[in-house]
Amino acid sequence: SCRSKADIDKYKWVADEKLYEDNDFVKEHHLSRHCIGLSGMKFTDAEIEVLAEKIRKMKADGTHLCCSIGFLTEHQAKVLKDAGLDRINHNLNSSRNYYPNICSTHTFDQRVANIRMLQGLGYEICSGGIIGMGESKEDVVDMLMELREIQPEALPINFLLPIPGTPLEHADMSVLSTAYCMKVLCLARLLVPKADIRCAAGREVYFKGEENMLLRVVDSIFAS
């Protein structure tokens, strides 16, 4: 984010050797899929072609591939689909009502439209949200009801980890008790029962010592 002053490593692309090494790890350990995350909201056609070539090489091993990649044009989405990309992650992040409080570069409706376009091209969809950004309980319910309409194949729930140098570095985390976090996951399970409910960021902090309890509600957890 242009608003972030966090101390992070910056680089264009992860080295091909690392990418293919991770893909080999996924295959050797019989993991369900390999998800590749890219920062940024939009990409050029030339950048998409570079990514498509990487996807072709990884897909040759039969890996189920997912990308978290921001907004795509229909042409770009078709290029990646033809290369073998199976799933795209595009989170709603919060409710329609609360979204302007966390993002000023685009609208909630633009995110929904991007997801609908991808579904129309035959992509599996991974879409969820982030809990702990100052939203109300009603906002959590509203976000999940929107996801109920979308019917993603996977629904990841992230619990905010405040990072120094970011706009939410001083966010009030007192609401995120283990019990509250579990209630959010249970609600996701009840409202979107066909989706794979996944616990993502924050599980090590908010479920510390209780992570086994997660598997009574969620289908999977994110690693690495």
Question: What residue spans do the PLM features occupy?
Answer:
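Glycine-rich, proline-tolerant flexible connector loops at the mouths of alpha/beta enzymes
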Residues: 3, 7, 35-47, 98-99, ...
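Canonical Radical SAM [4Fe-4S] cluster-binding loop centered on the CxxxCxxC motif
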Residues: 1-18
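Generic structural signal for well-ordered alpha-helices
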Residues: 20-23, 51-55, 77, 112-115, ...
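Conserved SAM/AdoMet-binding glycine-rich loop
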Residues: 29-115, 120-121, 133-134, 198-201
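Auxiliary Fe-S-binding modules of radical SAM enzymes
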Residues: 60-61, 148-224
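Alpha-helical scaffold segments that flank or form the walls of functional sites
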Residues: 15-30
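Aromatic-anchored, glycine/proline-accented short structural segments
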Residues: 102-161
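Catalytic cores of alpha/beta
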Residues: 73-82, 133-148, 204-216
